[in-house]
Design a protein with these regions (language model features):
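Phosphoinositide-binding peripheral membrane targeting modules
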Residues: 27-92
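Terminal and domain-flanking low-complexity segments
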Residues: 95-109
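Anionic N-terminal interaction surfaces
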Residues: 1-39, 81, 103
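Hydrophobic transmembrane alpha-helix bundles
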Residues: 16-25, 54-58, 95-96
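Generic structural signal for short, solvent-exposed loop/turn connectors between secondary structure elements
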Residues: 1, 7, 70-76, 94, ...
Length: 109
């Protein structure tokens, strides 16, 4: 499943692509604790695509929905407000976590 599937047609006219990452997202849903996933950014929002047992799941976040992004021990950590908490991406297979975190944090300010 191609999780980096965002195209120009998905963007608002004012949006431009930013960095993206693929890897393993650590997030508990029922009895599963990790999923293959991707984060894709634009200058206006962040997309999260996840392979949930062969089914694509997409969630879109405004930057106002994100507290911060950081890199710890080669893992990307996205911190969301209360409710979702922190989601880690480990085993990053494409993209640069430091560049990604810096881009997201720049959009927050």
């Amino acid at each position: 499943m191609d999780l980096l599937n965002l195209t120009e047609a998905d963007l608002y006219p004012t949006e431009k692509f930013g960095p993206s990452l693929t890897g393993t997202l650590l997030y508990k849903v029922r009895d599963q604790n990790y999923f293959q996933g991707a984060y894709m950014t634009t200058n206006e929002r962040m997309f999260m695509n996840v392979d949930m047992n062969g089914e694509a799941y997409t969630r879109v976040f405004a930057y106002t929905d994100i507290v911060k992004a950081s890199v710890e021990n080669d893992s990307l950590i996205i911190e969301f407000p209360d409710g979702m908490g922190k989601i880690a991406m480990v085993d990053i297979t494409s993209g640069d976590a430091d560049e990604f975190a810096q881009f997201v944090n720049n959009q927050l300010s």
